[in-house]
Amino acid sequence: MKLRRVFGIITVLTLMVTVVQAEPEVKTVLDGLTNPAGIAIQPKTGHVFVSDSGAGRIIRVDERGAHNVITGFPLGSYGKGPKYGIGPLGLTFIDRDTLVVGGGGLPDGEEMLRVYKVPAAGASAIKAREMAASFRLTGDADTKGEGNFYGLANNGKAIFVSSNGDDTKGWVAKASLKGGKVTKFERSIATKEVVEVDAPTGVAIAADGSLVVGQLGEITVPQDALISFYDTRSGKLLDNFETGLFDITGLAYSPKGKLFATDFAWMDTSQGGLFELKVARGSQSGVEAKKVLSLDKPTALTFSDRGELYVTVIGTSKEGSPAGKLLVVSGLK
């Protein structure tokens, strides 16, 4: 694992009244990762936290370098055809000291949404078992247990969690928040029943407060990914759009309010990348997906307050060496 120091530079050339902006610039912040799958930026510090999923750990990237924060997560696998080792998945902060981690290394029904008190910068890493709290969505005779808590979106009142347990339901779960703590974790929106495409994965909160869900769809079916908008209180579907993308893995809004998605493109990963989604809500014109960058198996993305976009990619391994990276993209228009 190597840290590469990154200083975002946007070159603006001015000649009389003409301003030319540089194209988006991509730099590697961290490499040597094993199937990274989640990113969160710590409030107040701006430190970047990454779930190095296949290595079973959470890493902090700060001005001193890259450091383990939580280690020893259980490991499982995901996928058809090529399978990828996974452990911790989605990340979000409740506050500066409280990190929520979606698990992916245990069987459905045993998997946990985990809450941690994060060690201070420079302190020793803690073990995955040292949780402040944990929650499961177990099964019974009539209900399948849930797991692979991939995407986490926090609106301050609840954390919405995409899960991939019961493929006939496609649940987005809801972790209610009160006083900086998770008080309840329950199934909330059966997305497969509503939009008839399975595998909710990327999630985000829109400017109007609605929940945006990216349906990954079948990895053996081309360009079936959807984005859907739901009321966070009632769970009612507000809008649903085809995107023309293969497999949406992440969604994020920029500080300017633009919606971006990562497409893994499982069937043909050469078509994967970062896309800007221009959505005409309340109309039949749908979504215009504009490709911004080609990326090698992207899995997650998030913006800093300054507009820098952090993206994780699995990459293509050579001779068994981990090929995952944390990238930073600057200069997005």
Task: Report the location of each language-model feature.
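Structural motif
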Residues: 109-114, 168-174, 221-228, 269-275, ...
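Bacterial N-terminal signal peptides that target proteins for export
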Residues: 1-9
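Acidic, Gly/Ser/Thr-rich repeat motifs that build Ca2+-stabilized beta-propeller blades
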Residues: 38-68, 81-130, 149-162
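Beta-propeller fold detector
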Residues: 27-30, 64-74, 123-138, 182-192, ...
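Bacterial N-terminal signal peptides
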Residues: 8-18
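Short loop/turn segments that connect beta-strands within beta-propeller blades
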Residues: 61-65, 117-122, 176-181, 230-236, ...
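Short loop/turn segments immediately following the C-termini of beta-strands
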Residues: 53-54, 104-106, 164-167, 215-218, ...
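Beta-rich, blade/repeat-based domains predominating
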Residues: 30-45, 75-102, 135-158, 192-216, ...
